[in-house]
Amino acid sequence: MDFQHRPGGKTGSGGVASSSESNRDRRERLRQLALETIDINKDPYFMKNHLGSYECKLCLTLHNNEGSYLAHTQGKKHQTNLARRAAKEAKEAPAQPAPEKVKVEVKKFVKIGRPGYKVTKQRDTEMGQQSLLFQIDYPEIAEGVMPRHRFMSAYEQRIEPPDRRWQYLLMAAEPYETIAFKVPSREIDKAEGKFWTHWNRETKQFFLQFHFKMEKPPAPPSLPAGPPGVKRPPPPLMNGLPPRPPLPDALPPPPPGGLPLPPMPPTGPAPSGPPGPPQMPPPAPGVHPPAPVVHPPTSGVHPPAPGVHPPAPVVHPPTSGVHPPAPGVHPPAPGVHPPAPGVHPPAPGVHPPAPGVHPPAPGVHPPAPGVHPPAPGVHPPPSAGVHPQAPGVHPPAPAVHPQAPGVHPPAPGIHPQAPGVHPQPPPGVHPAAPGVHPQPPGVHPTPMPPMLRPPLPSDGPGNMPPPPPGN
């Protein structure tokens, strides 16, 4: 066969296959695929005759190879014969009886009525769990019969319209009628001891009890109030620490500026009548009490009425380096300054220095050139925020207001005394108040300029120096 001169053929290669060759190759390929999925040895219509060819007993066809038979089985003729044979066999085959269903024999008895019952509602005292106890009387129950029960949904019964809020508990025993109890549709607690039944054969009584599950946890029981005078137990510890003690009802607020705390108010009943003057502690022996410090009127305060003498201005001692007189030492007379520390007084017969000339105190620098010393009898202004006090003398309260109209300030040399305490000064010597220079009788003090005004209590004792040590 000439494969080289065919149309489409190439020199050195095989020629184009004919249609018969293509069909043979296709049938072989299909046979291999069919053998992989179909086992012809199990086909009831496949048969190989004595000539070596294959026959189809259903269609009575002859095939030379297995591929031809497999192709026949997928054809229309073979499939039609299969359907015709199946219909014929189904028609000729005898009808087999259907499998019998299990039938429940219904017991037939004469009903004698409804049994007696008793329902008890119960509630657990500890947990607060609700339960129901049923007692059913079956005095005429049949021999060998035990009462039975079951829960039925509202959708199973046909007596009432279905309501999902309710369910039914059925009780049955021959020859009595079946009775049902309508209970709330809540979940039943089937735990041990929560659901139980009992049949008493002697009294012919049937008992059933069940509990509903708790929907919400019970609230903690409150402690009962004990009799008056009996203290309740302390609360439990929080994180292992005891509770904080209760604070007093009326605690005064802390004073501003670091001042000492005021005394606590009395807890007893308030005394009747007008309030008296504030009680001051008695002074120490040899120490004269200070005169009441009266501040000049600030802005917004009306001046005193005509004929009323203004209070004496508070004049503080010089700046640091000059200490106030020690306790028990009386200040000098008006216009005479005390000697500085470490300077002895002049001996008898020695004249003092001229008026207006003061010896320099230790630690006080001389004035710079061009600075004139103060005139005799004129004291330098106090430094800002310096309020020295003598040891043992309490500072005045920061809430002392100017005197009312018609009240004269104390005369120079007269000091108020604490109630019940009368210190005796030396005869003929009248001590002056600390920081206040007395004025001769009949001479009124001149008002102080605003620049020399003493600091107000609102300025705070931030720059107050400590008191000097006692000698």
Curated annotation (Swiss-Prot):
Subcellular location: Nucleus
A molecular function (GO) term: nucleic acid binding
SUPFAM superfamilies given in the database record: beta-beta-alpha zinc fingers
InterPro entries in the cross-refs: Matrin/U1-C_Znf_C2H2, Matrin/U1-like-C_Znf_C2H2, SF3A2, SF3A2_dom, Znf_C2H2_sf, Znf_C2H2_type
GO cellular component: catalytic step 2 spliceosome; nuclear speck; nucleus; spliceosomal complex; U2 snRNP; U2-type precatalytic spliceosome; U2-type prespliceosome; U2-type spliceosomal complex
SMART domains: CactinC_cactus, ZnF_U1
Keyword Acetylation among record annotations: yes
GO biological process annotation, one example: mRNA processing
Domain of life: Eukaryota
Modified residue annotations for N-acetylmethionine: 1
Pfam families for this protein: SF3A2 (PF16835), zf-met (PF12874)
Modified residues (N6-acetyllysine): 10
Zn-finger region bounds: Matrin-type: 54-84
Disulfide-bonded cysteines: none
Region listing for Disordered, in residue ranges: 1-27, 217-471
Function of the molecule: Component of the 17S U2 SnRNP complex of the spliceosome, a large ribonucleoprotein complex that removes introns from transcribed pre-mRNAs. The 17S U2 SnRNP complex (1) directly participates in early spliceosome assembly and (2) mediates recognition of the intron branch site during pre-mRNA splicing by promoting the selection of the pre-mRNA branch-site adenosine, the nucleophile for the first step of splicing.
Subunit annotation: Component of the 17S U2 SnRNP complex, a ribonucleoprotein complex that contains small nuclear RNA (snRNA) U2 and a number of specific proteins. Part of the SF3A subcomplex of the 17S U2 SnRNP complex which is composed of three subunits; SF3A3/SAP61, SF3A2/SAP62 and SF3A1/SAP114. SF3A associates with the splicing factor SF3B and a 12S RNA unit to form the mature 17S U2 small nuclear ribonucleoprotein complex (17S U2 snRNP). Identified in the spliceosome 'E' complex, a precursor of the spliceosome 'A' complex. Identified in the spliceosome 'A' and 'B' complexes.
UniProt cross-references to PANTHER family, sorted A to Z: SPLICING FACTOR 3A SUBUNIT 2
Family, as annotated: Belongs to the SF3A2 family.
Descriptive protein name: Splicing factor 3A subunit 2
Protein species of origin: Rattus norvegicus
Lineage of the organism: Eukaryota, Metazoa, Chordata, Craniata, Vertebrata
